[in-house]
Design a protein with these regions (language model features):
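N-terminal binding-site loop/beta-alpha segment at the start of enzyme catalytic domains
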Residues: 1-74, 141
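Structural preference for beta-strand elements that scaffold enzyme active sites
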Residues: 5, 13-17, 44-45, 69-73, ...
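Short, acidic/polar
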Residues: 25-38, 89-106, 152-162
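Active-site groove signature of glycoside hydrolases
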Residues: 100-124
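Acidic-and-aromatic substrate-binding clefts and catalytic sites of carbohydrate-active enzymes
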Residues: 23-29, 47-57, 81, 121, ...
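Beta/alpha (TIM)-barrel catalytic core signal, keyed to glycine-rich beta->alpha loops juxtaposed to Asp/Glu
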Residues: 118-198
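Structural motif corresponding to the early beta-alpha repeats
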Residues: 51, 63-92, 116-119
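Active-site mouth loops of central-metabolism enzymes
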Residues: 19-29, 79-95, 121-125
Length: 198
């Protein structure tokens, strides 16, 4: 498996990552084995944006025994509430959701602490100097989060993050289901160049 340097983190990650979405829809042991199989083939980065307890527990059991072989992305603001996914910046929900993530993944740290799903410039501005962002910085200072990343689908917001000085990597989908048949816009190509050659 070929690897690449991930953003400004210095981490050497596999060119193919493991996205854990929909793991909970499959038999538990089958999903755990799939994660272990991916690791045996050289995949070393896994995204855990999903807040549902089953998905998190599956990933925890899948990386158990070889945690040091994985770079784990954990998202701040992706919470499980009323038996469904919710996106929030409310610290009364964000903190317990992150603590649950650590517990279910059976780990003391997250390699990539992700600012979860920022798709508007207004929201980007709102989280600056917020308790939400300060919490992530505090966890990075303590070593609980090794690097700070962000997920977005908006090129303007992603560019602001790339230039922020503290976001070290971006999870940015250039293919969204709603636009998968349209050509990639020039602004997206410019953003990718900025991320690869800051």
């Amino acid at each position: 498996m070929k690897t690449r340097t991930l953003g400004k983190t210095g981490l050497q990650v596999s060119e193919i990552g493991f996205g854990g979405e929909w793991l909970e829809r499959h038999p538990y042991e089958e999903s755990v084995e799939l994660i272990r199989y991916a690791s045996s083939k050289g995949i070393n980065i896994i995204d855990c944006w999903m807040p549902d307890p089953k998905s998190r527990s599956i990933i925890g059991d899948g990386i158990k025994g070889n945690r040091d072989q994985w770079y784990v992305q954990g998202h701040f603001g992706s919470v499980w509430k009323y038996d469904q996914y919710c996106r929030t910046r409310d610290m009364d929900d964000v903190k317990p959701a992150f603590e649950d993530l650590l517990a279910r993944l059976q780990t003391e740290y997250i390699d990539l602490g992700m600012i979860h799903y920022v798709d508007s410039e207004e929201e980007w501005e709102m989280i600056q100097d917020s308790d939400y962002l300060n919490y992530i910085f505090e966890l990075k200072d303590k070593g609980v989060v090794r690097h700070i990343g962000m997920s977005s689908h908006n090129p303007r917001v992603a560019r602001k993050a790339a230039l922020s000085g503290y976001v070290e990597m971006l999870l940015f989908s250039i293919i969204r289901p709603s636009i998968c048949c349209r050509p990639v816009k020039t602004s997206t190509i410019c953003l990718l160049r900025l991320l690869m050659h800051p």
